[in-house]
Regions:
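Hydrophobic alpha-helical transmembrane bundles of multi-pass membrane proteins
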Residues: 1-178
Length: 178
């Protein structure tokens, strides 16, 4: 069960990178990049931080560099920082999309955007609370923090759209939550 839980992180993390190259590279390149990235970037960093490696609380850095410790409860470093760095590098290498920013393409189906955002919101409960590895108070606090964070982001995005455009949008609310 723990292995499958960890594999969901490994499978979902490349999805965060997709926005940097969507519609600009071929599907075979996506599969090739994803496989290489998981093996050579994600897996080593997950081990270094979560698996007792040199950046973990039990590793070399903690024992050698007094006061140095790494705490990554649910993937801030392993998932988000790694994906962000990869996305920035890919975006820089590929350059801007054709027609951007003069041609902005709105989403084709706002209903599906909202369903996807809702699925992500619920999925975060599993990732964040599941990282406690127990159904206890820490997991409950993780779920509460997850919900409050996403809800606050929605409200802030609504306010920003209202100030900027005079009315909020469904896609904007979903974007804020994500």
């Amino acid at each position: 069960v723990f292995f499958m839980f960890q594999m969901t992180f490994a499978i979902v993390t490349p999805g965060l990178i997709v926005g940097a190259y969507v519609e600009r590279i071929k599907f075979n390149a996506v599969i090739f990049f994803t496989a290489l990235w998981i093996v050579f970037v994600y897996a080593p960093s997950a081990h270094w931080i979560w698996g007792g490696g040199f950046l973990s609380d039990l590793g070399w850095a903690s024992s050698t560099l007094k006061g140095f410790s790494t705490m990554d409860f649910a993937g801030g470093l392993v998932v988000h920082a790694n994906a962000a760095i990869a996305a920035l590098v890919i975006a820089k290498v590929l350059g801007s999309r054709k027609g951007f920013p003069n041609e902005l393409r709105p989403p084709h189906n706002p209903g599906l955007v909202m369903i996807g955002a809702a699925m992500l919101w619920v999925g975060w409960y599993g990732f964040n609370a599941g990282s406690a590895l127990a159904a206890d108070g820490i997991a409950g606090m993780a779920m509460t923090a997850t919900h409050i964070s996403a809800a606050t982001a929605c409200l802030v995005w609504i306010l920003i759209e209202y100030i900027k455009f005079g009315k909020p949008s469904l896609v904007g609310i979903a974007t804020g939550a994500i």
